[in-house]
């Protein structure tokens, strides 16, 4: 009997711990992961949760309607059939998708979270990640397009429709891959000790990667717009010494400054707090990040509602097209481009390029 006892395998404590850490928990309930992370999982609807859900649904409806209006306006008005407007339409499509993704989230949050499986929870979060990533990537693409046109002294980028389609496909492909990464393996289901507090099924390393990726994109946008502004300011100051219209140059520079401040300010206000919160979730365990999670999530989603206003509503031609669509009026520009249509294109384009071409009457 002693021999039989000694022949049985003995698992040491370190080996047992290693085996336990490598165990996957894909069959566990969502409550299991939330309890481990310390994140509260509601059992019933309270006043705060109802208010957040009501506000979220309202924002979603506005996002979808506003961005749908932008897409229709660009489609019906042939004066908008240029690369910059195709990118703006794609941005509107991305933000429309963000509204749908967030709408899905609203009906699968709060007490409804308990009913989700691991797969559906990852799908819910993946839709949000994809929608937000594609919106940021579109903002970057627009910044790059503006940078190219200004420094080449063009009103519109000389880019073929095929290249625009390639850019759009690359943006969506990258965003879908980013959103799907946690579902295909970069999660904490088999690495339970490294689960995030804010996203209990997400790995800390993925959240750090995603936050840094978006922050780097933000920095690139700041650099691009700062370079544009510096170039235009230098040109206007140089030409004001040899022209009779310094006030016009000064007004052009200030108008550009306002546009850049609005664009960058909206991005900073809506995105930076949430991205910093993700980093604090990993780097600062004692920080109470969960207390601000829902607020910053709503704030980030507001960016999708603001993009149509920032990039489209400042355009007088776009505003007129909006009114014609809402009033069911037929636009004169839907039948085809008219002579001098380039001169009536985006006021935002004119703002950027007027300082560069202040002596070029074909742009005025």
Curated annotation (Swiss-Prot):
Positions where Phosphoserine occurs in the chain: 341
PROSITE patterns in the record: G_PROTEIN_RECEP_F1_1 (PS00237), G_PROTEIN_RECEP_F1_2 (PS50262)
Spans through the membrane: 51-75, 84-107, 122-144, 164-184, 205-225, 256-280, 295-315
Modification Phosphothreonine, positions: 351
Subcellular location: Cell surface; Cell membrane; Endosome
Database matches in InterPro entries: GPCR_Rhodpsn, GPCR_Rhodpsn_7TM, LPA_rcpt, LPA_rcpt_EDG2
Keyword annotations of the record: Cell membrane, Disulfide bond, Endosome, G-protein coupled receptor, Glycoprotein, Membrane, Phosphoprotein, Receptor, Transducer, Transmembrane, Transmembrane helix
Record topological domains on the Extracellular side: 1-50, 108-121, 185-204, 281-294
Keyword Flavoprotein: no
Cytoplasmic side: 76-83, 145-163, 226-255, 316-364
Chain's role: Receptor for lysophosphatidic acid (LPA). Plays a role in the reorganization of the actin cytoskeleton, cell migration, differentiation and proliferation, and thereby contributes to the responses to tissue damage and infectious agents. Activates downstream signaling cascades via the G(i)/G(o), G(12)/G(13), and G(q) families of heteromeric G proteins. Signaling inhibits adenylyl cyclase activity and decreases cellular cAMP levels. Signaling triggers an increase of cytoplasmic Ca(2+) levels.
Subunit structure: Interacts with RALA and GRK2. Interacts with GNAQ and GNA13. Interacts with CD14; the interaction is enhanced by exposure to bacterial lipopolysaccharide (LPS).
Recorded family membership: Belongs to the G-protein coupled receptor 1 family.
Record-given protein name: Lysophosphatidic acid receptor 1
